[in-house]
């Protein structure tokens, strides 16, 4: 990339065995930023018509947690600019991405649904949240909940999944068994 004169950002997929290792290799070749995560065009199958249907499924806030996890991990191991794409629909979603380490968010589905004026709502929602928490800038909040700085970093790890399942198992004993 020595001949490239503009900053290059790579939009990643979540399908890497070791996302931090892959991002490190990108950093070594001169990439300046990464965005988590690219969404794929995913046609579906219509069982009645027996045909493949084109669909465009907008993102929802349910898409955000996967990206937050990646940001929380990458922001501890990379100096690259980190972007978040997918699942950002409110100022609070922007704040979540920043807390996990994002420098930028990309918004499409929310704008398709609400129009360009929605950008002002995202901005005002973020500013309101920052002010309410005592942050003067988004830079002050960036990475506060990443893997190294979160009050309980294990919440980002697989061990938390195991603890969650154990809690579910404990609750399942409340049920009457036949």
Residue spans of the language-model regions?
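Helical hairpin unit composed of two closely spaced alpha helices linked by a short loop
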Residues: 104-114
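A generic structural signal for well-ordered alpha-helical surface patches
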Residues: 72, 95, 99, 117-127, ...
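C-terminal helical cap(s) of enzyme catalytic domains, especially alpha/beta-barrels
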Residues: 45-60, 112-135
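Charged C-terminal helix
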Residues: 128-168
């Amino acid at each position: 990339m020595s001949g490239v004169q503009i900053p290059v950002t790579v939009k990643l997929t979540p399908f890497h065995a070791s996302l931090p290792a892959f991002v490190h290799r990108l950093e070594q070749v001169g990439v300046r930023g990464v965005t988590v995560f690219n969404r794929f065009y995913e046609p579906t199958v219509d069982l009645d018509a027996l045909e493949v249907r084109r669909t465009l499924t907008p993102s929802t806030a349910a898409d955000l947690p996967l990206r937050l996890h990646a940001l929380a991990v990458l922001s501890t191991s990379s100096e690259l600019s980190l972007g978040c794409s997918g699942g950002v629909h409110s100022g609070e979603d922007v704040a979540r991405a920043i807390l996990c380490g994002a420098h930028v968010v990309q918004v499409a589905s929310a704008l398709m649904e609400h129009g360009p004026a929605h950008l002002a709502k995202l901005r005002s929602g973020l500013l309101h949240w920052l002010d309410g928490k005592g942050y003067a800038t988004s830079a002050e909040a960036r990475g506060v909940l990443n893997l190294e700085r979160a009050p309980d970093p294990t919440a980002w790890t697989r061990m938390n999944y195991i603890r969650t399942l154990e809690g579910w198992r404990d609750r399942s004993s409340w049920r009457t068994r036949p």
